[in-house]
Amino acid sequence: MGCHTRLLWLLFFHAAILPEAACYRRDFRGSGARLGKERPKRSSIQGVSEEQQEGHGEEPAARPQGDGNPATILSVLPAAISTQPSSKLAPSSSVSVLPVADSAPGSRRAHAPRINLKGADMLPDLTPVIDPESYKPSGGWAPVRLAGNHGSCAGRVELFYQGVWGTVCDDLWDLPQANIICRQLGCGWAVSALSEAYFGQGSGKILLDNVHCKGHEEHLEECSHLGWFSHNCDHSEDASVICSDAEYGTVTLSDPPLAAMEGATNPEKSRCGGVITSAPGKIKNPPMNEMHDNITCVWEIRASTSEHIRLAFPSLDLDCTNEYFEILDGPPSSTKSLGKPCRGLHITFASHSSSMTLVYFRGENNIGKNFMAYYYFEAKEMTTKTPYLITIPTATSKMVTERPQFSNTPSGNISPLPVSDSGDWPELRLVGGSSRCSGRVEILYQGVWGTICDDLWGSNEAEVVCRQLECGQAVSSLGEAYFGPGSGEIFLDNLQCSGMEHYLGQCPHSGWSEHNCGHHEDAGVICSDSDAPPPPMPPGPPPTPQDPLTGGSNSCGGVISSLSGSFTSPRYPENYPTDIQCVWEIHVEKNFRIELMIPNLNLEDILGCPYDSIEIFDGPRIASLSMGKFCAPSAVVFFSSSDILTVVFRSDYMTTNTGFYAFFNAIPQDGRESEERPVLRLAGSSGQCSGRVEILHQGAWGTVCDDLWDLNEAEVVCRQLGCGHAIAAPGSAYFGPGSGNILLDNIQCSGTENHFGQCSSSAWLDHNCGHHEDAGVICSDADVTPSPTEGSHSCGGVISNLSGSFSSPWYPTNYPTDTECIWEIHVAEKFNIELTIPSLK
């Protein structure tokens, strides 16, 4: 582990009751002055003039200059006068967090690349016109228009207020604000949030500044702002948007797309990976000195269960062979890939679930390039379309192709077919298999049958094919002309399905007959209703004489119904083929569960397993929890919670290895609960609900390694011990190193298990750790409440005081590595909370 400079922080909070006549919010975002321009300081108190504010305390802070650390302030006001209650508070809390202006150094948002609209001067003025005399606002909301002669869905944002049209300042302007404008105008969603008078300077009044939205608002005025006509801007900073329904001439990129945005992101999100739970925000590339060869960064974005996630790349220009992203519709264990973008303009993704994962890969001998991604949360009920990849019309976009040797030309635009309710989609058939539910996928287009290229072909696409053909669920998605090469046209390439579509025609693709493939890459599927096993792969070794297992399978996937058995990756122990996906679904009798053991696992071992992997699902693959995704050489053991277990094996188009050998046994359900429920204790602290996790095995106590250790595992420990829920999951021997054996490593829990024995892990005593990596937990019932006046060095806890302070562990010395702490602050019902972070390093 490399050495990094560690920064520290200290926080203070207090609860207060303020007069109900006004809602005072101090502007801590600072001055956004550009070089050579000095801005006057402005009031941030909505609806109160500068003269009226005399005597109300010190003047709002100027925008910070240089690299000073920001002070994070959560204004805490009586709940009764809060107009923007948070939607993410625990039900037991009445706390309302009011948004304040951005405090990032420099305070200016990132600016999107300049777009030239060719022929725009010849367009008629399509800006909506409202007669001030005849206008009567509906519901009291100000009308909105997009000006600048670029159509009704792209342009400078203008609002009609008190009889005049005016503009909006671009301070804090970003995708959540732009998305509300697009939604309000019926123009889809925001593709770009543009600033610095991108579509030309407006005239007249500047109506709003520091607009800050959460994303669920229906009108821009519902967002927090400085107040009508209160700003520190001029028309060179007018805000603009481009919506997804914009229709205008050729779009070209003329300015370096990311140079203007570099440094505008929160530094916490420029590291290589992490978990993100707040929005909106930006993710940028790690510092260049940290972008080593063969680096993989994994970011997981988590929204609430009522929201989904939108992600936008203003521009990508990566080496599509050795540097690209993969976007997963869910957590890192998700099998639903939304795409592998590497090059293009305004590439936008939408998740179907409440989480999304970005996997960034950079190979050898590659000069890493800058990138920036914007994300925000949106209520699920606002989504009316299946998630798909979309690009601005006539823009160029390129996805990673699965055959670099045939990638001589860009794959073209990726665009979805229009969705209709008629069900009039192209006809499909499966050819070359043993039944109508397995074979090479062929599609009827303009009266001719043709094939589909296997680039980006995966389980989502196979699932849609099986659904359209009424053949059950997808068992395998196969490439490389598994069922033999077809003939004639190759109609489709780079198909991208979410897995929820009813017809393959609803999935986006590169365009009819647009491909870079040959028939040796024809895609195939095996569906669950296939009445015969798939064509056999070259046989693997028979079980050893000591191994009594039967009912095994060396083919690529299938349904196994027996009390014991074995199966291997195709061609085992020789190298498995590239570009293949196999799904084994194991069924045992209803009163049994399944023990799965993989004693030998040799795949392409890359952090995060983005290429080759084996993933275990606790039940049928559809709608079952993932028990883990693995690619590192190790012995793993899993126990199902029901009579079904699913194993998914995937390989990509490049490196292969010898694969794996797996066997399973049926275990009676009645006996497993007591046999597999381990005895736990927490050591190294003063209470029973916080400490180093220790487990009893074969009469001796041992510790647990912190690899993959997080709140999910800690939650199960706290539940089993009756200690409430998990507040923190510290690693690095936070409670001191243990002694004796390290019993478990790579533990993976979903967080819903009743006891620790239901989580997957490496085998007993199989680890690569030392006691300096012992895992710990802090549960909500632990006695770690800080003093109301003195700082606490505990890692998390529940605080129930009217004022107090707390700090990062070991403050003011460096905090420990591999630690996650959660403090939950409770005050009286009629109070909200003000949180101040004067020192953050």
From Swiss-Prot:
Glycans are attached at residue 294. Residues 1-23 form the signal peptide. Residues 532-546 have a biased composition (Pro residues). Residues 144-244, 428-528, 680-780 form the SRCR domain. CDD domains: CUB (cd00041). Residues 85-105 have a biased composition (Low complexity). InterPro entries: CUB_dom (IPR000859), SJ_maturation_regulator (IPR053243), Sperma_CUB_dom_sf (IPR035914), SRCR (IPR001190), SRCR-like_dom_sf (IPR036772). SUPFAM superfamilies: Spermadhesin, CUB domain, SRCR-like. Pfam families: CUB (PF00431), SRCR (PF00530). Residues 272-378, 556-667, 795-841 form the CUB domain. Keywords: Disulfide bond, Glycoprotein, Repeat, Signal. Disulfide bonds join 169-233, 182-243, 213-223, 272-297, 320-342, 453-517, 466-527, 497-507, 556-582, 609-631, 705-769, 718-779, 749-759, 795-821. One of its GO terms (cellular component) is membrane. Residues 32-69, 85-116, 528-552 are annotated as: Disordered. Belongs to the DMBT1 family. This is Putative DMBT1-like protein. The lineage of its organism: Eukaryota, Metazoa, Chordata, Craniata, Vertebrata.
